[in-house]
A protein has these predicted regions:
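Short, basic and Ser/Thr-rich N-terminal targeting/leader segments
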Residues: 77, 84-86, 152, 176
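FAD-binding subdomain of flavoenzyme oxidoreductases
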Residues: 110-113, 122-181
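N-terminal flexible segment immediately upstream of the FAD-binding catalytic core
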Residues: 1-72, 76, 86-118, 147, ...
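ATP-grasp fold ATP-binding core
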Residues: 81-83, 144
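Short glycine/serine/threonine/alanine-rich loop segments
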Residues: 76-79, 140
């Protein structure tokens, strides 16, 4: 049984300072600190529940790089950051009590396909079933088959090296990734 989260704690000032500086430096994504927004990110497909202090939704790799650059500064060294895709992991990997970096809201584009060489370039928030629907006319698909493939993102699959039905034949996620940026 999942224990209930008690009173909604306020957001700590250091997190608010980070978010303010993030926006001042040109962050184009969204930020969220309301209890409702934080509560939606407090669970995944596991039995765990952790209420984050804030959620950021980058729109581009430049936004992700800005988050990383700012987080690396000494004054923010105590903050914890966790990337999140579809929240389909079963071991709590997408949860923390710091800042969630949600890749699924905006960074969900299929950028390029090269059918001759057999590769596709996508953003981390692309959902596996959507990718396979896109690839089908080219005679390709992205393995492995997951029970959560209608909401699992490629970034999350890479993070957990997802495997599932057909993995013995087609391999796990890392067997199909040429590179990440």
């Amino acid at each position: 049984m999942i224990p209930q989260i008690s009173q909604a704690p306020g957001v700590v000032q250091l997190v608010l300072n980070f978010l303010q500086e993030l926006e001042q430096q040109g962050f184009t994504g969204d930020t969220a600190t309301s209890y409702a927004d934080r509560l939606t990110m407090s669970t995944d497909n596991s039995i765990y529940q952790l209420l984050p202090d804030a959620v950021v939704f980058p729109r581009s790799t430049a936004d992700v790089a800005l988050i990383a650059r700012l987080a690396a500064q000494e004054r923010y060294s105590s903050l914890i950051f966790t990337p999140r895709g579809g929240g389909t992991g079963t071991k709590g990997q997408a949860l923390n009590q710091g800042i969630i970096v949600d890749m699924s809201r905006h960074m969900n584009r299929i950028i390029e396909i090269n059918p001759e060489e057999g590769w596709v370039r996508v953003e981390a928030g692309v959902i596996k079933d959507q990718l396979n629907q896109y690839l089908k006319p080219f005679g390709y698909f992205f393995a492995p088959e997951l029970s959560t493939s209608n909401r699992a993102t490629l970034g999350g699959m890479i993070n957990t090296d997802a495997s599932g039905q057909g993995s013995l034949v087609y391999g796990k996620t890392s067997d199909h990734v040429l590179g990440v940026r």
